[in-house]
From Swiss-Prot:
Taxonomic classification: Eukaryota, Viridiplantae, Streptophyta, Embryophyta, Tracheophyta
Domain of life: Eukaryota
Listed InterPro entries: PP2C, PPM-type-like_dom_sf, PPM-type_phosphatase-like_dom
Protein family membership: Belongs to the PP2C family.
Name of this protein: Probable protein phosphatase 2C 8
Organism: Arabidopsis thaliana (Mouse-ear cress)
GO molecular function per UniProt: metal ion binding; protein serine/threonine phosphatase activity
Catalytic activity: O-phospho-L-seryl-[protein] + H2O = L-seryl-[protein] + phosphate; O-phospho-L-threonyl-[protein] + H2O = L-threonyl-[protein] + phosphate
Cofactor: Mg(2+); Mn(2+)
Keyword Hydrolase (UniProt): yes
Keyword Membrane carried by entry: no
Length: 351
């Protein structure tokens, strides 16, 4: 995403000793009981909490609508630095973000932050975005879609504002793209900036019992995010109005490929934005699973290809942790992904 990355990393001091070549949260944590505070598994750096997302069955996050339909959400993550010398992706798997707010809507949060020119911006966003979204008024009692979207927009704005202040004082120059998911009750919100992507696997029909009918049939892959690159007309227009130049290589000022990101303070004056696109949908029996991935994953997997790969493994009865690991392994070892590669697989089950 950023050419001449070495020019931008001279003043940063990332701690990469925790970034293994290949990683899943299953490798790090064991089953835990429900914590008194929000349980988080976060990766790509020194702040790795020793709690997991495989709780006892009665403690797993589920979401109940007014019709009392209940969905179990299982998720896990895997990462690999690929051919890169350092790992600049970080991630969050927060299966129950509502434990700090008793009596509120059940909430889950998942995110991938893909750093470029370093990992400081990605780490900052991981630590602050979710809290800023909550502080901005993410609904906790009665779901209001407009209010939720407004809170997400404000959370992104506030996070980037604070990051830019920090980057000036700390001499940071790096940036990070993001793909984030919040699940409130049965409503799913997906927000992204840059080229990280979320793909939904949906069945074409359900039978009269409400069960999936995709057995033997491919699921439909639905891309829930929109890529933000400087070469795309809508993004190019904003950049040019801000005085930015798209070079012949398709990059802003000849260097930055993405047009929306956290950080990148030297490019903000040229129209780089941290305003996300937000997509919302309702969980029904047709939604099977989601795949969140950084651009490294999608460079070697098409959306339908990735959905088919995951569907096959899930039909074999493999746990979501194994599925996420195999997806990343396939991308890096078999398909020769050269970039950092991180994927979160989120499975929806009706119980």
């Amino acid at each position: 995403m950023l050419e001449k990355e070495s020019d931008l990393t001279a003043m940063e001091k990332p701690n990469n000793k925790h970034a293994a070549d290949s990683f899943s949260s299953e490798d790090l944590v064991s089953p835990v009981k429900k914590a008194k505070k929000s349980e988080e598994v976060s990766g790509g750096g020194e702040a790795v909490a020793a709690v997991g997302n495989r709780e006892a069955e009665e403690d797993k996050p589920s979401f109940v609508s007014e019709e009392k339909k209940e969905f179990l959400v299982e998720a896990d993550v895997a990462e690999d630095k690929g051919a890169r010398h350092t790992m600049e992706d970080v991630w969050v798997v927060l299966p129950d973000a509502s434990l700090d707010f008793p009596g509120t809507l059940r909430c889950a949060h998942f995110a991938i932050y893909d750093g470029h020119g370093g990992r400081l911006a990605a780490e900052f966003a991981k630590k602050h975005l979710h809290l800023n979204v909550l502080s901005a008024g993410l609904p906790r009692e009665l779901l209001d879609v407009k209010v939720a979207k407004k809170a997400i927009l404000e959370g992104f704005r506030k996070t980037d504002e604070l990051l830019l202040q920090k980057s000036v004082s700390g001499g940071w120059q790096d940036g990070a793209t993001a793909v984030c998911v919040w699940i409130l009750d049965q409503k799913v919100f997906v927000a992204n900036i840059g080229d990280a992507k979320a793909v939904l696997a949906r069945s074409s029909t359900t039978n009269e019992l409400g069960n999936h009918t995709e057995a033997g049939n491919p699921l439909k892959a639905i891309v829930l995010t929109r890529e933000h690159k400087a070469i795309y007309p809508q993004e190019r227009s904003r950049i040019q109005k801000s005085g930015g130049v798209i070079s012949s290589n398709g990059r802003l000022q000849g260097r930055l490929e993405v047009s929306r990101a956290f950080g990148d303070r030297h490019f903000k004056k040229f129209g780089v934005s941290a305003t996300p696109d937000i997509h919302a949908f309702e969980l029904t029996e047709r939604e099977n699973f989601m795949i969140l991935g950084c651009d490294g994953l999608w460079e070697v997997f098409g959306p339908s290809d990735a959905v088919g790969f995951v569907q096959k493994l899930l039909k074999e009865g493999l746990h979501v942790s194994t599925v996420s690991r195999r997806l990343v392994k396939e991308a890096v070892k078999e398909r020769r992904c050269k970039d950092n590669c991180t994927a979160i697989v989120i499975v929806f089950k009706r119980v």
